[in-house]
Amino acid sequence: MSDVTVANYHAFPDARGHFGRYGGRFVAETLIGPLQELAQAYDAARHDPDFIAAYNKDLKDYVGRPSPIYHAERLSRKVGGAQILLKREDLNHTGAHKINNTIGQALLAARMGKTRIIAETGAGQHGVASATVAARLGLECVVYMGATDIERQQINVYRMKLLGATVVPVTSGSATLKDALNEAMRDWVTHVGHTFYIIGTVAGPDPYPRMVRDFNAIVGREARAQMIEDYGRLPDAMTACVGGGSNAIGLFHAFLNDASVRIYGAEAAGDGIATGRHAASIVAGRPGVLHGNRTYVVCDDDGQILETHSVSAGLDYPGVGPEHAFLADSGRVQYVGIRDEEALAAFHLLAHTEGILAALESSHAVAHAMTLARDLPKDALVLCNLSGRGDKDVHTIAAREGVRV
């Protein structure tokens, strides 16, 4: 990691969509025009009081915001050390943080006169959230999903279909999130005249990383105000899972300039970094270009993207949002790898102590929150983003543990 001195983390990206040496637009010439059109439309919308009012109204009345911060008292006692607090994004409509972003992008699509939206999805939560807002706004919806992920997330596939979306299986490559994103990009190039591509994470070419961040930043703004109101201070540490990194940057962004708050991103270490079967782009990757932006990627010595592994479909991605790459280089956020078995243990412990089934993605963050808590005094506060609920993962966990359901 290089040494980067930053006075104000909220000053990024720059006018060209760069977070330091990361980000940008590394795309075919055919996409430059559509991306410029999208950037102009988004910049106009985010300064339009009517658009912001409509977005905030939907967050309140449709999504059900604000989401609460819950003190996991029994989990904290079981783990020992600091108090673990959960930002309950799992309580949002559709069961995850993804709806914060899809509401914003769908409203922008309608504002631009687009009649069709497309999306990629891994765990299925972004696909469900995209299908949900498409149904609400009367837009056609097509979701690209890797065939491997379809097998392990059949409940969410059926939810998308119930909502009126067409789910397109992607069989190329490893048939996971990376490949679904590739196919969605190809669709967008072909049908850009009437199609809006709702990217589900803070990756992709500019303006997507900043746009998805901005629509998810409500998580951190709420959490900051809630911490001050309920506890009279900011947390000592916070953590969130990181695949592409949208839930994490949504929580982190409001706290980046608060030097007293230690921030951690929990990547998927899969079977262990040393095995090569992981999806830890920052912990075990290197800078490269993927899906239109420069960032950290999981690749070989020649720069070729490698297949990744995680028990969690939503973290099974060989890249990470460029802002996370920048935050890693600056040292503001520390990124750690959480193995499958650690995430599964955290899933079970949270269920047994608090009656909460967390998504496998979120369980990576819960696992690291537990590690942080053990090394801190009892009066310290650790905030963990519970980015989604785990109903979708019950069959995956049961199959892994030899239970027939």
From Swiss-Prot:
Pfam families: PALP. Keywords: Amino-acid biosynthesis, Aromatic amino acid biosynthesis, Lyase, Pyridoxal phosphate, Tryptophan biosynthesis. GO terms for cellular component: cytoplasm. Its cofactor is pyridoxal 5'-phosphate. It comes from the Bacteria. It is an enzyme of class 4 (lyase). Its EC number is 4.2.1.20. The modification N6-(pyridoxal phosphate)lysine is found at K98. Pathway: Amino-acid biosynthesis; L-tryptophan biosynthesis; L-tryptophan from chorismate: step 5/5. Tetramer of two alpha and two beta chains. Belongs to the TrpB family. This is Tryptophan synthase beta chain.
